[in-house]
A protein has these predicted regions:
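Hydrophobic, small-residue-rich alpha-helical packing segments that form membrane-like cores
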Residues: 51, 55, 76-78
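Short loop/turn segments that connect beta-strands within beta-propeller blades
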Residues: 12-16, 54-58, 104-108
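Blade-terminus and WD-like Trp-Asp/Gly-His loop motifs, strongest in beta-propeller folds
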Residues: 1, 27-37, 73-82, 127-128, ...
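A flexible loop/linker signature enriched in serine peptidases of the S9 family
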Residues: 1-7, 18-22, 39-50, 64-70, ...
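Generic hydrophobic/packing signal
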Residues: 12-17, 31, 40
């Protein structure tokens, strides 16, 4: 069953100014508070997408949009890049397949890093939407989970960026 998000309110505590974002299912704030990233979803999928907000200017960027689930959004501690998984390419199919993406705040679009069949993902395994993602301290590597169709999970390091 597709979930529908709720309203997220971003309030500047000094000025009291509020900005509201509809259909939010998950959100993440960078450690320095300068970047807010959120996933949106609506029952009819028209609002589905992943968005980034500069909290100082309130400028918004659509990272990736379209009918899908956007999960495991992970910001690097500096807030200048993120990784996430989505089933955008298989949304609505009986068997959902997730793809790992990487995005930098200055990039126009995210980069596809891994999915079923890519180098670094063992044969018969695919990107899992259940495991956590993590960045290395320097932000040059991403740690991801991949799983077999049986549901067994195994940690793999993916250095293809």
């Amino acid at each position: 069953k597709k979930s529908e998000g709720t309203e997220l309110v971003l309030r500047n505590l000094k000025s009291g100014k509020e900005t509201r974002y509809a259909h939010v299912v998950s959100y993440h704030l960078s450690e320095d508070g300068k970047h807010l990233v959120y996933a949106a979803a609506s029952k009819d999928s028209t609002a589905d997408g992943l968005y980034a907000i500069n909290t100082n200017t309130r400028d918004s960027v659509a990272i990736l949009t379209g009918p899908a689930d956007y999960k495991k959004i992970t910001l690097h501690e500096k807030g200048d890049q993120l990784t996430f998984v989505t089933n955008r390419d298989s949304f609505g199919a009986e068997q959902q397949e997730y793809t790992l993406y990487h995005w930098k705040t200055k990039a126009k679009a995210p980069t596809q890093i891994a999915k079923f069949g890519t180098r670094g993902i063992p044969s018969g395994r695919w990107v899992s939407e259940h495991g956590n993602l993590a960045f290395s301290k320097d932000g040059k590597k991403t740690l991801l989970w991949n799983s077999a169709q049986t549901g067994n999970r195994k940690r793999r390091r993916n250095t293809q960026r």
